[in-house]
Protein backbone atom coordinates (compact mmCIF):
# COMPACT_ATOMS: atom_id res chain seq x y z
CA UNK A 1 0.00 0.00 0.00
CA UNK A 2 1.66 3.19 -1.18
CA UNK A 3 -1.05 5.52 0.17
CA UNK A 4 0.77 8.51 1.67
CA UNK A 5 -1.99 9.04 4.26
CA UNK A 6 -0.83 6.04 6.28
CA UNK A 7 1.08 6.83 9.43
CA UNK A 8 1.23 10.58 8.88
CA UNK A 9 -0.46 11.55 12.12
CA UNK A 10 -3.55 13.54 12.93
CA UNK A 11 -5.12 16.56 11.29
CA UNK A 12 -2.66 19.42 11.50
CA UNK A 13 -4.77 22.51 10.99
CA UNK A 14 -8.25 23.55 9.90
CA UNK A 15 -8.79 26.50 7.61
CA UNK A 16 -12.05 28.47 7.68
CA UNK A 17 -13.79 29.08 4.36
CA UNK A 18 -14.12 32.55 2.86
CA UNK A 19 -14.70 32.80 -0.90
CA UNK A 20 -14.50 36.60 -0.88
CA UNK A 21 -10.76 36.72 -0.26
CA UNK A 22 -7.76 34.95 -1.74
CA UNK A 23 -6.90 32.12 0.65
CA UNK A 24 -3.68 30.98 -1.05
CA UNK A 25 -1.34 32.29 1.63
CA UNK A 26 -3.31 30.83 4.55
CA UNK A 27 -3.68 27.38 2.98
CA UNK A 28 -0.03 27.31 1.88
CA UNK A 29 1.08 28.30 5.39
CA UNK A 30 -0.85 25.35 6.83
CA UNK A 31 0.72 22.99 4.26
CA UNK A 32 4.24 24.27 4.95
CA UNK A 33 3.82 24.12 8.74
CA UNK A 34 2.45 20.60 8.49
CA UNK A 35 5.48 19.52 6.44
CA UNK A 36 7.96 21.12 8.86
CA UNK A 37 6.26 19.31 11.74
CA UNK A 38 6.89 15.94 10.13
CA UNK A 39 3.83 15.57 7.94
CA UNK A 40 0.14 15.01 8.41
CA UNK A 41 -3.20 16.08 7.00
CA UNK A 42 -4.40 19.59 6.29
CA UNK A 43 -8.20 19.71 6.51
CA UNK A 44 -10.39 22.50 5.19
CA UNK A 45 -13.75 23.20 6.79
CA UNK A 46 -16.77 22.94 4.44
CA UNK A 47 -17.22 25.98 2.25
CA UNK A 48 -15.70 27.82 -0.72
CA UNK A 49 -12.07 28.92 -0.87
CA UNK A 50 -10.60 31.11 -3.59
CA UNK A 51 -6.98 30.23 -4.25
CA UNK A 52 -4.04 30.64 -6.56
CA UNK A 53 -1.25 28.08 -6.92
CA UNK A 54 -0.78 25.70 -3.98
CA UNK A 55 2.31 23.53 -3.49
CA UNK A 56 1.86 20.26 -1.58
CA UNK A 57 4.96 19.14 0.33
CA UNK A 58 6.41 15.72 1.14
CA UNK A 59 4.48 13.85 3.81
CA UNK A 60 1.40 16.07 3.53
CA UNK A 61 -2.15 15.09 2.59
CA UNK A 62 -4.43 17.95 1.56
CA UNK A 63 -7.88 16.69 2.47
CA UNK A 64 -10.83 18.11 0.55
CA UNK A 65 -13.84 16.74 2.39
CA UNK A 66 -17.37 16.70 1.02
CA UNK A 67 -18.68 20.25 1.02
CA UNK A 68 -15.25 21.78 0.40
CA UNK A 69 -14.73 23.60 -2.91
CA UNK A 70 -11.47 25.20 -3.98
CA UNK A 71 -12.23 27.97 -6.48
CA UNK A 72 -9.22 28.69 -8.67
CA UNK A 73 -8.40 32.34 -9.20
CA UNK A 74 -9.06 33.40 -12.81
CA UNK A 75 -6.04 35.74 -12.73
CA UNK A 76 -2.93 34.21 -14.26
CA UNK A 77 -0.55 36.28 -12.09
CA UNK A 78 -1.69 34.16 -9.13
CA UNK A 79 0.21 31.24 -10.69
CA UNK A 80 4.00 31.82 -10.62
CA UNK A 81 5.87 30.70 -13.70
CA UNK A 82 8.65 28.12 -13.70
CA UNK A 83 10.25 25.80 -16.23
CA UNK A 84 8.15 22.72 -16.88
CA UNK A 85 7.10 20.69 -19.90
CA UNK A 86 4.03 21.70 -21.87
CA UNK A 87 2.62 19.72 -24.80
CA UNK A 88 5.95 18.01 -25.33
CA UNK A 89 8.56 20.79 -24.93
CA UNK A 90 10.29 22.27 -21.91
CA UNK A 91 9.49 25.94 -21.43
CA UNK A 92 8.40 28.49 -18.83
CA UNK A 93 4.74 28.10 -17.90
CA UNK A 94 2.37 29.09 -15.07
CA UNK A 95 2.02 26.78 -12.09
CA UNK A 96 -1.05 24.60 -11.81
CA UNK A 97 -3.72 25.19 -9.19
CA UNK A 98 -2.36 22.25 -7.16
CA UNK A 99 1.33 21.40 -7.59
CA UNK A 100 3.40 18.52 -6.24
CA UNK A 101 6.92 19.22 -7.51
CA UNK A 102 10.12 17.51 -6.33
CA UNK A 103 8.26 15.80 -3.48
CA UNK A 104 7.70 12.30 -2.09
CA UNK A 105 4.86 10.61 -0.26
CA UNK A 106 2.20 13.30 -0.70
CA UNK A 107 -1.48 13.25 -1.57
CA UNK A 108 -4.72 15.11 -2.19
CA UNK A 109 -7.86 13.25 -1.14
CA UNK A 110 -11.50 13.56 -0.15
CA UNK A 111 -14.91 14.01 -1.73
CA UNK A 112 -14.66 17.75 -2.30
CA UNK A 113 -14.20 19.76 -5.49
CA UNK A 114 -11.43 21.64 -7.27
CA UNK A 115 -13.21 24.06 -9.59
CA UNK A 116 -10.59 25.61 -11.86
CA UNK A 117 -13.00 28.11 -13.45
CA UNK A 118 -11.05 27.89 -16.68
CA UNK A 119 -13.42 29.53 -19.13
CA UNK A 120 -11.39 32.74 -19.11
CA UNK A 121 -8.49 30.73 -20.56
CA UNK A 122 -10.70 28.88 -23.06
CA UNK A 123 -12.00 32.17 -24.44
CA UNK A 124 -8.48 33.59 -24.60
CA UNK A 125 -7.28 30.59 -26.60
CA UNK A 126 -10.09 30.65 -29.17
CA UNK A 127 -9.51 34.35 -29.85
CA UNK A 128 -5.76 33.82 -30.27
CA UNK A 129 -6.36 30.75 -32.43
CA UNK A 130 -8.29 32.82 -34.99
CA UNK A 131 -5.52 35.41 -35.17
CA UNK A 132 -2.70 32.88 -35.34
CA UNK A 133 -4.29 30.71 -38.02
CA UNK A 134 -4.66 33.78 -40.23
CA UNK A 135 -0.91 34.41 -39.84
CA UNK A 136 0.18 30.82 -40.51
CA UNK A 137 0.99 30.27 -36.84
CA UNK A 138 -1.37 27.44 -35.91
CA UNK A 139 1.64 25.38 -34.82
CA UNK A 140 2.64 27.78 -32.02
CA UNK A 141 -0.61 29.18 -30.63
CA UNK A 142 -0.95 26.39 -28.05
CA UNK A 143 2.40 27.48 -26.59
CA UNK A 144 1.92 31.25 -26.80
CA UNK A 145 -1.45 31.05 -25.07
CA UNK A 146 -0.47 30.33 -21.48
CA UNK A 147 -3.20 28.61 -19.49
CA UNK A 148 -3.41 27.09 -16.04
CA UNK A 149 -3.38 23.33 -15.51
CA UNK A 150 -5.55 21.79 -12.81
CA UNK A 151 -2.97 19.56 -11.10
CA UNK A 152 0.74 19.07 -11.77
CA UNK A 153 2.79 16.20 -10.36
CA UNK A 154 6.39 16.73 -11.48
CA UNK A 155 9.65 14.96 -10.55
CA UNK A 156 7.89 13.29 -7.63
CA UNK A 157 7.23 9.77 -6.36
CA UNK A 158 4.70 7.92 -4.21
CA UNK A 159 1.91 10.40 -4.94
CA UNK A 160 -1.83 9.73 -4.62
CA UNK A 161 -4.85 11.70 -5.84
CA UNK A 162 -8.07 10.17 -4.59
CA UNK A 163 -11.79 10.72 -4.57
CA UNK A 164 -12.39 14.37 -5.41
CA UNK A 165 -13.95 16.17 -8.39
CA UNK A 166 -11.81 18.21 -10.78
CA UNK A 167 -13.70 20.52 -13.11
CA UNK A 168 -13.41 23.31 -15.69
CA UNK A 169 -9.62 23.22 -16.00
CA UNK A 170 -8.04 26.02 -18.02
CA UNK A 171 -5.68 23.58 -19.73
CA UNK A 172 -4.80 19.94 -18.97
CA UNK A 173 -6.61 18.46 -16.00
CA UNK A 174 -3.91 16.42 -14.27
CA UNK A 175 -0.36 16.10 -15.62
CA UNK A 176 2.01 13.48 -14.20
CA UNK A 177 5.46 14.52 -15.44
CA UNK A 178 8.89 12.93 -14.87
CA UNK A 179 7.44 11.01 -11.91
CA UNK A 180 7.00 7.44 -10.70
CA UNK A 181 4.76 5.37 -8.46
CA UNK A 182 1.71 7.62 -8.73
CA UNK A 183 -1.91 6.56 -8.18
CA UNK A 184 -4.98 8.39 -9.48
CA UNK A 185 -8.01 6.76 -7.84
CA UNK A 186 -11.65 7.71 -8.07
CA UNK A 187 -11.37 11.17 -9.60
CA UNK A 188 -14.36 12.66 -11.39
CA UNK A 189 -13.16 15.06 -14.08
CA UNK A 190 -15.72 17.28 -15.79
CA UNK A 191 -14.48 19.88 -18.25
CA UNK A 192 -17.69 20.21 -20.28
CA UNK A 193 -19.41 22.84 -18.17
CA UNK A 194 -20.09 26.30 -19.54
CA UNK A 195 -18.25 26.11 -22.84
CA UNK A 196 -15.86 24.21 -25.11
CA UNK A 197 -12.51 24.00 -23.37
CA UNK A 198 -9.57 23.49 -25.76
CA UNK A 199 -6.79 21.15 -24.63
CA UNK A 200 -8.71 20.17 -21.51
CA UNK A 201 -7.28 16.64 -21.38
CA UNK A 202 -8.41 14.64 -18.38
CA UNK A 203 -5.25 12.85 -17.22
CA UNK A 204 -1.85 13.15 -18.94
CA UNK A 205 0.90 10.68 -18.07
CA UNK A 206 4.05 12.29 -19.42
CA UNK A 207 7.49 10.59 -19.36
CA UNK A 208 6.56 8.82 -16.14
CA UNK A 209 6.74 5.23 -14.89
CA UNK A 210 4.74 2.86 -12.71
CA UNK A 211 1.43 4.71 -12.83
CA UNK A 212 -2.01 3.41 -11.79
CA UNK A 213 -5.23 5.11 -12.89
CA UNK A 214 -8.39 3.48 -11.56
CA UNK A 215 -12.06 4.16 -10.83
CA UNK A 216 -12.03 7.51 -12.65
CA UNK A 217 -14.85 9.15 -14.63
CA UNK A 218 -13.50 11.57 -17.25
CA UNK A 219 -15.59 13.98 -19.34
CA UNK A 220 -13.46 16.51 -21.23
CA UNK A 221 -12.74 18.20 -24.56
CA UNK A 222 -9.52 16.46 -25.56
CA UNK A 223 -7.90 13.12 -24.74
CA UNK A 224 -9.56 11.51 -21.73
CA UNK A 225 -6.55 9.55 -20.47
CA UNK A 226 -3.44 10.35 -22.46
CA UNK A 227 0.07 8.89 -22.43
CA UNK A 228 2.92 11.10 -23.67
CA UNK A 229 6.72 11.33 -23.78
CA UNK A 230 7.80 14.59 -25.44
CA UNK A 231 7.77 15.90 -28.98
CA UNK A 232 10.20 16.59 -31.80
CA UNK A 233 13.81 17.66 -31.20
CA UNK A 234 13.22 18.69 -27.60
CA UNK A 235 11.49 15.44 -26.72
CA UNK A 236 14.27 13.45 -28.35
CA UNK A 237 16.80 15.47 -26.34
CA UNK A 238 15.08 14.62 -23.04
CA UNK A 239 14.44 11.04 -24.19
CA UNK A 240 12.47 9.78 -21.19
CA UNK A 241 9.79 7.12 -21.78
CA UNK A 242 6.43 6.52 -20.23
CA UNK A 243 6.20 2.88 -19.22
CA UNK A 244 4.42 0.47 -16.92
CA UNK A 245 0.97 2.06 -16.82
CA UNK A 246 -2.25 0.37 -15.67
CA UNK A 247 -5.65 1.93 -16.39
CA UNK A 248 -8.65 0.04 -15.00
CA UNK A 249 -12.28 0.43 -13.97
CA UNK A 250 -12.61 3.85 -15.65
CA UNK A 251 -15.30 5.58 -17.70
CA UNK A 252 -14.52 8.01 -20.52
CA UNK A 253 -17.33 10.25 -21.70
CA UNK A 254 -16.94 13.11 -24.17
CA UNK A 255 -13.33 13.46 -25.32
CA UNK A 256 -10.81 12.42 -27.97
CA UNK A 257 -9.90 8.98 -26.66
CA UNK A 258 -10.56 6.69 -23.73
CA UNK A 259 -6.87 5.81 -23.88
CA UNK A 260 -4.67 7.87 -26.19
CA UNK A 261 -0.97 7.30 -26.80
CA UNK A 262 0.69 10.38 -28.32
CA UNK A 263 0.99 12.51 -30.22
CA UNK A 264 4.05 13.27 -28.08
CA UNK A 265 5.97 9.99 -28.56
CA UNK A 266 9.63 11.06 -28.70
CA UNK A 267 10.75 9.29 -25.53
CA UNK A 268 8.67 6.18 -26.37
CA UNK A 269 5.60 4.69 -24.71
CA UNK A 270 5.55 1.06 -23.65
CA UNK A 271 3.93 -1.49 -21.39
CA UNK A 272 0.41 -0.09 -21.03
CA UNK A 273 -2.49 -2.22 -19.81
CA UNK A 274 -6.11 -1.07 -19.84
CA UNK A 275 -9.02 -3.26 -18.73
CA UNK A 276 -12.59 -3.15 -17.46
CA UNK A 277 -13.23 0.17 -19.16
CA UNK A 278 -16.21 2.00 -20.62
CA UNK A 279 -16.38 4.58 -23.42
CA UNK A 280 -19.55 6.66 -23.73
CA UNK A 281 -19.39 9.28 -26.45
CA UNK A 282 -15.63 9.63 -26.63
CA UNK A 283 -14.00 9.73 -30.05
CA UNK A 284 -11.97 6.50 -29.88
CA UNK A 285 -11.65 3.53 -27.58
CA UNK A 286 -7.92 3.39 -28.33
CA UNK A 287 -6.11 6.16 -30.20
CA UNK A 288 -2.46 6.04 -31.27
CA UNK A 289 -1.06 9.18 -32.88
CA UNK A 290 2.28 10.71 -33.77
CA UNK A 291 3.98 12.66 -36.56
CA UNK A 292 6.99 12.23 -38.81
CA UNK A 293 9.18 14.46 -36.63
CA UNK A 294 8.31 12.95 -33.25
CA UNK A 295 10.31 9.74 -33.22
CA UNK A 296 10.01 7.18 -30.46
CA UNK A 297 8.09 3.92 -30.34
CA UNK A 298 4.64 3.01 -29.07
CA UNK A 299 4.77 -0.67 -28.13
CA UNK A 300 3.31 -3.33 -25.90
CA UNK A 301 -0.15 -1.79 -25.55
CA UNK A 302 -2.87 -4.08 -24.18
CA UNK A 303 -6.55 -3.18 -23.93
CA UNK A 304 -9.30 -5.63 -23.00
CA UNK A 305 -12.78 -5.89 -21.49
CA UNK A 306 -14.25 -2.68 -22.88
CA UNK A 307 -17.83 -1.54 -23.41
CA UNK A 308 -18.36 1.33 -25.84
CA UNK A 309 -21.26 3.29 -27.28
CA UNK A 310 -21.55 6.35 -29.50
CA UNK A 311 -17.86 6.38 -30.37
CA UNK A 312 -16.17 7.34 -33.63
CA UNK A 313 -13.63 4.50 -33.71
CA UNK A 314 -12.76 1.38 -31.80
CA UNK A 315 -9.16 1.78 -32.98
CA UNK A 316 -7.59 4.87 -34.56
CA UNK A 317 -3.87 4.73 -35.37
CA UNK A 318 -2.09 7.41 -37.40
CA UNK A 319 1.66 7.98 -37.83
CA UNK A 320 1.05 11.40 -39.42
CA UNK A 321 -1.55 13.06 -37.21
CA UNK A 322 -2.83 16.65 -37.58
CA UNK A 323 -0.14 18.19 -39.84
CA UNK A 324 -1.21 21.81 -39.25
CA UNK A 325 -0.39 21.36 -35.57
CA UNK A 326 2.43 18.83 -35.83
CA UNK A 327 4.82 20.65 -38.18
CA UNK A 328 6.38 24.03 -37.43
CA UNK A 329 7.04 26.48 -40.26
CA UNK A 330 8.06 30.09 -39.68
CA UNK A 331 6.21 32.50 -42.01
CA UNK A 332 8.48 34.63 -44.17
CA UNK A 333 7.50 37.87 -42.46
CA UNK A 334 9.10 36.60 -39.23
CA UNK A 335 12.40 35.57 -40.81
CA UNK A 336 15.35 37.51 -39.42
CA UNK A 337 13.33 38.84 -36.50
CA UNK A 338 13.80 38.06 -32.82
CA UNK A 339 11.47 35.24 -31.79
CA UNK A 340 10.75 33.70 -28.36
CA UNK A 341 12.83 30.80 -27.07
CA UNK A 342 9.95 28.33 -27.31
CA UNK A 343 9.46 29.24 -30.97
CA UNK A 344 13.12 28.37 -31.58
CA UNK A 345 12.65 25.08 -29.74
CA UNK A 346 9.65 24.21 -31.88
CA UNK A 347 11.50 25.16 -35.07
CA UNK A 348 14.58 23.06 -34.28
CA UNK A 349 14.75 20.33 -36.94
CA UNK A 350 15.23 16.68 -36.10
CA UNK A 351 18.52 15.49 -37.61
CA UNK A 352 18.85 13.20 -39.32
CA UNK A 353 15.16 13.24 -40.36
CA UNK A 354 14.92 9.46 -39.91
CA UNK A 355 15.35 9.95 -36.17
CA UNK A 356 11.92 11.55 -36.19
CA UNK A 357 10.11 8.58 -37.70
CA UNK A 358 7.81 7.01 -35.08
CA UNK A 359 7.05 3.29 -34.73
CA UNK A 360 3.84 1.60 -33.56
CA UNK A 361 4.07 -2.11 -32.77
CA UNK A 362 2.78 -4.89 -30.54
CA UNK A 363 -0.76 -3.64 -29.91
CA UNK A 364 -3.47 -5.96 -28.58
CA UNK A 365 -7.17 -5.09 -28.35
CA UNK A 366 -9.70 -7.73 -27.28
CA UNK A 367 -13.08 -8.39 -25.68
CA UNK A 368 -14.73 -5.19 -26.86
CA UNK A 369 -18.48 -4.70 -27.29
CA UNK A 370 -19.36 -1.49 -29.10
CA UNK A 371 -22.64 0.05 -30.26
CA UNK A 372 -23.25 2.96 -32.61
CA UNK A 373 -19.72 3.26 -33.96
CA UNK A 374 -19.08 5.65 -36.85
CA UNK A 375 -16.10 3.73 -38.27
CA UNK A 376 -14.81 0.53 -36.70
CA UNK A 377 -11.12 0.99 -37.52
CA UNK A 378 -8.84 3.62 -39.03
CA UNK A 379 -5.27 2.35 -39.01
CA UNK A 380 -2.61 3.75 -41.29
CA UNK A 381 1.15 3.52 -41.48
CA UNK A 382 3.19 5.90 -43.63
CA UNK A 383 4.75 3.94 -46.49
CA UNK A 384 6.33 0.61 -47.42
CA UNK A 385 9.18 1.06 -44.94
CA UNK A 386 7.20 2.58 -42.09
CA UNK A 387 4.29 0.34 -41.25
CA UNK A 388 2.10 -0.43 -38.26
CA UNK A 389 3.51 -3.73 -37.00
CA UNK A 390 2.11 -6.64 -35.01
CA UNK A 391 -1.43 -5.52 -34.26
CA UNK A 392 -3.89 -8.09 -32.89
CA UNK A 393 -7.61 -7.36 -32.61
CA UNK A 394 -9.84 -10.24 -31.55
CA UNK A 395 -13.09 -11.12 -29.77
CA UNK A 396 -14.76 -7.84 -30.75
CA UNK A 397 -18.42 -7.15 -31.49
CA UNK A 398 -19.36 -3.79 -33.00
CA UNK A 399 -22.38 -2.19 -34.64
CA UNK A 400 -20.87 0.31 -37.06
CA UNK A 401 -21.77 2.54 -39.99
CA UNK A 402 -18.46 1.83 -41.73
CA UNK A 403 -15.92 -0.97 -41.24
CA UNK A 404 -13.05 1.46 -42.00
CA UNK A 405 -9.56 1.09 -43.45
CA UNK A 406 -6.24 -0.62 -42.79
CA UNK A 407 -3.24 0.66 -44.75
CA UNK A 408 0.53 0.14 -44.71
CA UNK A 409 0.72 -2.53 -42.03
CA UNK A 410 2.77 -5.64 -41.35
CA UNK A 411 1.40 -8.63 -39.44
CA UNK A 412 -1.95 -6.97 -38.76
CA UNK A 413 -4.39 -9.56 -37.42
CA UNK A 414 -8.14 -9.43 -36.92
CA UNK A 415 -10.01 -12.53 -35.76
CA UNK A 416 -13.29 -13.35 -34.07
CA UNK A 417 -14.62 -9.98 -35.20
CA UNK A 418 -18.39 -9.56 -35.50
CA UNK A 419 -19.54 -6.42 -37.26
CA UNK A 420 -23.14 -5.35 -37.69
CA UNK A 421 -23.07 -3.10 -40.72
CA UNK A 422 -24.64 -2.59 -44.12
CA UNK A 423 -23.70 -5.24 -46.66
CA UNK A 424 -22.44 -2.68 -49.16
CA UNK A 425 -19.84 -1.40 -46.72
CA UNK A 426 -16.48 -3.16 -47.00
CA UNK A 427 -13.23 -2.55 -45.25
CA UNK A 428 -10.57 -0.76 -47.29
CA UNK A 429 -7.26 -2.61 -47.42
CA UNK A 430 -4.11 -1.14 -48.97
CA UNK A 431 -0.43 -2.14 -48.94
CA UNK A 432 -0.60 -4.63 -46.06
CA UNK A 433 2.04 -7.33 -45.55
CA UNK A 434 1.70 -10.69 -43.81
CA UNK A 435 -1.68 -9.76 -42.41
CA UNK A 436 -4.65 -11.90 -41.47
CA UNK A 437 -7.82 -9.86 -41.89
CA UNK A 438 -10.75 -12.12 -41.09
CA UNK A 439 -14.20 -11.03 -39.97
CA UNK A 440 -16.23 -13.95 -38.71
CA UNK A 441 -20.02 -13.88 -38.71
CA UNK A 442 -20.25 -10.39 -40.09
CA UNK A 443 -23.90 -9.38 -40.22
CA UNK A 444 -25.93 -6.76 -42.01
CA UNK A 445 -28.49 -4.42 -40.59
CA UNK A 446 -31.38 -4.20 -40.13
CA UNK A 447 -32.21 -7.88 -40.62
CA UNK A 448 -28.81 -9.20 -39.39
CA UNK A 449 -28.23 -11.60 -42.29
CA UNK A 450 -24.77 -13.15 -42.44
CA UNK A 451 -22.72 -11.23 -44.98
CA UNK A 452 -19.46 -13.12 -44.89
CA UNK A 453 -16.00 -11.63 -44.87
CA UNK A 454 -15.96 -7.87 -45.50
CA UNK A 455 -12.27 -7.64 -46.33
CA UNK A 456 -11.26 -7.17 -49.95
Which role fits each region the language model picked out?
Residues 1-12:
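Single conserved hydrophobic/aromatic residue that forms the stacking wall/gate
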Residues 14-43:
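Acidic Gly/Asp/Thr-rich repetitive segments characteristic of extracellular carbohydrate-active
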Residues 28-35, 66-67, 96, 104-113, 116-173, 180-193, 237-239, ...:
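Right-handed parallel beta-helix
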Residues 31, 275, 292-456:
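Beta-rich accessory regions
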Residues 39-85, 91-94, 99, 113-114, ...:
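N-terminal extracellular ligand-recognition/capping segment immediately after the signal peptide
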Residues 53-56, 69, 73-74, 96-101, ...:
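Glycine-rich beta-solenoid repeat tracts in large extracellular/virion proteins
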Residues 79-98, 125-148, 329-355:
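Surface-exposed acidic, glycine/proline-enriched linker/cap segments
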